[in-house]
């Protein structure tokens, strides 16, 4: 995508009467009771392994947006490779359900990768991550020298879908 695509999509959303009707409770928020105080925007490039968004199951009640911070661009490229070559496969095996993955190209947090996953509920999410941490493939991957020092920290933001959510 480019800036032209961004503007076309934005106009398409604003022209979508179904979207606008579903979002009306959000649009009706007032200053004393805002939906948010501000928001951040990121431009991300999709990973080769998951080049487009995957739609979550309708049973989802929990999304997790994770950000992995790297010390420099080279370490970040190795983290992207780690996901593309190995890590996403382990996610699939243990029930960490993918929506999208991206390398941050522009935004307030760089260098970094971000990805969104979904779960039926919090206990299901916790069980999937326990399986991930114990999985033999992860135990092997996390100790490979080519993936050493790829992320300095990670953060998670937990989200709940609203009636007007497109996912």
Question: What residue spans do the PLM features occupy?
Answer:
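Short S/T/G/P-rich N-terminal loop/turn motif that feeds into the first structured element of a domain
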Residues: 1-138, 147-167
């Amino acid at each position: 995508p480019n800036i032209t695509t961004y503007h076309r999509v934005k106009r398409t959303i604003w022209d979508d009467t179904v979207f606008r009707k579903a979002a009306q409770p959000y649009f009706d928020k007032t200053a004393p009771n805002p939906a948010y105080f501000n928001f951040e925007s990121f431009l991300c490039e999709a990973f080769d392994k998951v080049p487009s968004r995957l739609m979550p199951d309708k049973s989802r009640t929990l999304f997790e947006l994770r950000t992995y911070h790297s010390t420099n661009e080279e370490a970040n490229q190795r983290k992207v490779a780690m996901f593309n070559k190995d890590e996403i496969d382990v996610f699939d095996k243990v029930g960490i359900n993918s929506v999208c993955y991206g390398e941050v190209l522009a935004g307030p947090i760089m260098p970094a990768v971000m990805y969104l996953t979904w779960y039926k509920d919090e206990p299901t999410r916790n069980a999937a991550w326990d399986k991930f941490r114990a999985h033999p493939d992860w135990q092997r991957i996390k100790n490979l020298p080519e993936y050493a020092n790829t992320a300095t920290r990670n953060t998670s933001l937990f989200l709940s879908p609203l009636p007007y959510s497109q996912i």
